[in-house]
Design a protein with these regions (language model features):
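Conserved catalytic network of the ASCE P-loop NTPase/AAA+ motor domain
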Residues: 154, 181-184, 208-212, 235-238, ...
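Core recognition of P-loop NTPase motor domains used across DNA-transaction enzymes
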Residues: 2-47, 51-156, 223
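Phosphate-binding/switch region of NTP-binding enzymes
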Residues: 161-163, 167, 171, 264-356
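The Walker A/P-loop phosphate-binding site
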Residues: 38, 116-211
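Short, flexible loop segments at the rims of nucleotide/cofactor-binding pockets, characterized by
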Residues: 138-140, 220-223, 257-259, 289-293
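C-terminal regions of RecA-like/P-loop NTPase motor modules
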Residues: 1-61, 72-73, 237-238, 275, ...
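Conserved inter-motif catalytic segment of the P-loop NTP-binding fold
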Residues: 52-57, 61, 65-66, 185-264, ...
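A generic local structural motif
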Residues: 146-150, 175-176, 229-232, 266-269, ...
Length: 379
């Protein structure tokens, strides 16, 4: 939304219903799937924006930004004020309108009616929701809906997951996956909640030592995903990102990962970032319980982590012998819309100035890991 242009306040007879602020042209826009709403007055330089919408005890709250270019208004960079407001409450709206009147130094403008109109438009749009469509009208995709990297299949538009104990090579293989997708012409990005950019840059140089590093966009995240989702989404839309990884999910949470509400909020933020154009990979750790049987491993925290992913891979690593590769078994644990995939052996070779990642035969390279393969794959 462009910035409003500074202009004079409304002319004569400002109190009537014919005043420009009341009777003038306006444009109301819903951004995305209701992530933001914007009301722009065409004849008076005023704009309302509501973002970060959420329900609190059935009332709709939002961060409201009011931009104004009226002469004499108390603004900072065209912003009159920013405040979290209860759009469902008439008394709260009235109080906020008084703030707008004071800051704008324009008592001739009926701020109460303007803000009421904006709130009612937002409430109506939220109540309308998304219209239904016929399943038969949903467009088909040209591919099978999965990326394949060394036999590990990941949903192109849904949520995939890697989960394992520490020191299982999750992060380096995640970087490798992003690079391989980038080499196929798919714009990719990493959201890093554990480390910083320079180590990943050095790893990328070792993974692709020929100097032809694939383009991987990188964001070092310091706040919970739900708080950074808006800025990340704008960046991803600007760069056309079609696949991204979150490494790792627990530091990206706003509250305990054991709580269903935390996972649901995380999922909503991640889906908002992805929009309709991008697939995503969640990287996490497993529950630290030695009594868990093979095949029952899951993300650390609430069961909702495993329930929400569409393609899930549990990683089990065998400690490398000095000078040897790190051997990892990727076991296909979640398979919505995808037939059961065989477990995949991945060898990570840490060499001088280089990291090589190859597929390997677990029976030959790591018999102990091969013993954990499903019976049908060992026959």
């Amino acid at each position: 939304v462009g910035r409003v242009t500074r202009a004079a306040a409304a002319p004569a007879d400002p109190w009537s219903d014919d005043a420009p602020a009341i009777a003038g042209r306006r444009e109301f826009e819903q951004v995305g799937d209701g992530e933001r709403y914007v009301l722009t007055l065409q004849d008076v330089p005023i704009e309302f924006e509501a973002a970060h919408l959420r329900r609190v005890r059935d009332d709709l709250h939002a961060q409201v930004t009011v931009r104004c270019a009226l002469s004499g208004a108390r603004v900072y960079q065209d912003t009159l004020t920013v405040s979290t407001e209860n759009l469902s409450s008439a008394s709260h709206r009235f109080r906020f309108a008084r703030v707008l009147e004071h800051q704008s130094r324009a008592p001739q403008i009926d701020w109460t009616r303007l803000f009421d109109e904006f709130a009612i438009r937002v409430l109506t749009a939220e109540a309308a929701g998304r219209p239904s469509v016929l399943l038969s009208d949903i467009p088909d995709r040209l591919d099978d809906g999965y990326h394949d990297v060394l036999g590990v299949k990941l949903a192109t538009h849904g949520i995939s997951g890697f989960y394992a104990k520490g020191d299982s090579g999750k992060s380096v293989f995640t970087l490798f996956v992003l690079g391989e997708l980038a080499k196929r012409g798919i714009p990719v990005a990493m959201l890093d909640y554990e480390w910083e950019g320079l180590p990943h840059k050095k790893r990328a140089a070792q993974l692709w030592p020929d100097g032809q590093q694939p383009p991987i966009r990188y964001i070092q995240c310091t706040r919970p995903l739900r708080e950074e989702a808006e800025s990340i989404r704008r960046d991803f839309l600007h760069h056309g990102i079609r696949y991204f990884a979150i490494d790792s999910v627990v530091p990206a949470c706003h509250d305990s990962p054991n709580l269903p509400d935390t996972v649901i909020a995380f999922n909503r933020a991640a889906r908002y970032v992805a929009g309709t154009q991008a697939g995503q990979l969640w990287v996490g750790h497993v529950v630290k319980n030695k009594e868990i049987a093979d095949g029952d491993e899951t993300f650390f925290g609430s069961v909702f982590w495993g329930n929400l992913i569409r393609a899930g891979w549990f990683i089990k690593a065998q400690p490398s012998i000095e000078g040897g590769p790190l051997i990892c078994a990727y076991h296909h644990r979640k398979r919505n819309g995808l037939p059961q995939q065989p477990s995949v052996g991945i060898a990570i070779h840490f060499e001088i100035g280089r990291i090589r990642i190859t597929r390997c035969d677990l029976a030959d390279s790591a018999p102990d890991l091969a013993a954990g393969l499903p019976l049908w794959q060992r026959m």
